[in-house]
Structure formats: structure tokens, C-alpha cells
């Protein structure tokens, strides 16, 4: 593994352990040239999941891109980064190869965010659904509010 600090190709593994619920292996390495330490992750390469964009262009699924979108929507909100990371990195394993339209990725991300935080959900929805007016925001917020009103309420008696 090439050292990210000095680009030396020589390193040794100090520690290995399962990560992401066994979906990957986390390795601590030490460069034999500069002696700095770094972490790498190893995961099985399955058939790549291809994302079909609205324009029709296909590209390989990138969990980091999904994670960035979720993190941006959840910025300064009480949403655990670990939950976002788990969702983004397990997404490809759930779908398992083939093709998926960006609309489906967005829909699943919104389904994931909704119970976690309303503000993060609205932020993500505003980009995913391409809100073009204040009315669209209000409509979505009313939909959230209506969903809360339908939930059963506990009887204090």
C-alpha cells in the first residue's frame, strides 16, 4: 500500500479488524520509509452498482458522494455521523449490483432521514426534489406536520 505522506510503496500492517459490521476490514499501517501511520479499508469488489442520472449518463455508485449529501443535510443537527456513514456504505450491499436511478437513491435517503430529523429531511428533500419556490417548502413541511398528526398519541389517563 502506497504511503499517503511520502508515496513510498513499502508499509507494514500493524493491526487489522472488521469494520462496517463485517463488510470491510480496517487496517492500521506504518510506512517503512517515513514511519508515519495511516488507516486503510478493504472490502470485497462485487459487481459495481451503476447510477443512472437524470440525463441518462451512467456512473459507478460512490458512497462518499451519498455520505456528503446526507452530512450536508444533517449539518449542525443532532444526527449521528456514524448512522449516516453506515447507511451510505451499506447502501451498495443492499442494492447489490445492477443499475439504480438517482431518483431511487434520493427516495431511499429521504426515507432514512425522515425518522432521524425533520430539518435534515427537509434540507435533503429541497435538493432532491428541486424545490423552486417557498410554496414547495411549505407544502413539504405541511406534509411532515400532517404525518405527525396521524401518529397515535399516548393517553395520559
From Swiss-Prot:
Molecular-function annotations in GO: ATP binding; double-stranded DNA binding; zinc ion binding
Superkingdom field: Bacteria
Keyword line: ATP-binding, DNA-binding, Metal-binding, Nucleotide-binding, Repressor, Transcription, Transcription regulation, Zinc, Zinc-finger
Cofactor(s) the protein requires to work: Zn(2+)
Coiled coil regions in record: none
Pfam families, sorted: ATP-cone (PF03477), Zn_ribbon_NrdR (PF22811)
Similarity annotation: Belongs to the NrdR family.
Record's protein name: Transcriptional repressor NrdR
Gene that this polypeptide is encoded by: nrdR
Amino acid at each position: 500500500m502506497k504511503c499517503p505522506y511520502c508515496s513510498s510503496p513499502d508499509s507494514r500492517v500493524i493491526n487489522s479488524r472488521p469494520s462496517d459490521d463485517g463488510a470491510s476490514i480496517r487496517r492500521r499501517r506504518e510506512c517503512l520509509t517515513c514511519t508515519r501511520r495511516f488507516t486503510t479499508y478493504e472490502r470485497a469488489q462485487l459487481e459495481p452498482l451503476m447510477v443512472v442520472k437524470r440525463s441518462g449518463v451512467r456512473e459507478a455508485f460512490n458512497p462518499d458522494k451519498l455520505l456528503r449529501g446526507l452530512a450536508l443535510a444533517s449539518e449542525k443537527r443532532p444526527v449521528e455521523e456514524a448512522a449516516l456513514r453506515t447507511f451510505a456504505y451499506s447502501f451498495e450491499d443492499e442494492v447489490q449490483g445492477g443499475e439504480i436511478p438517482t431518483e431511487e437513491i434520493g427516495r431511499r435517503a429521504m426515507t432514512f432521514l425522515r425518522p432521524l430529523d425533520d430539518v435534515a429531511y427537509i434540507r435533503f428533500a429541497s435538493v432532491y426534489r428541486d424545490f423552486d419556490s417557498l410554496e414547495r417548502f411549505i407544502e413539504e413541511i405541511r406534509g411532515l406536520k400532517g404525518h405527525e398528526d396521524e401518529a397515535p398519541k399516548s393517553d395520559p389517563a
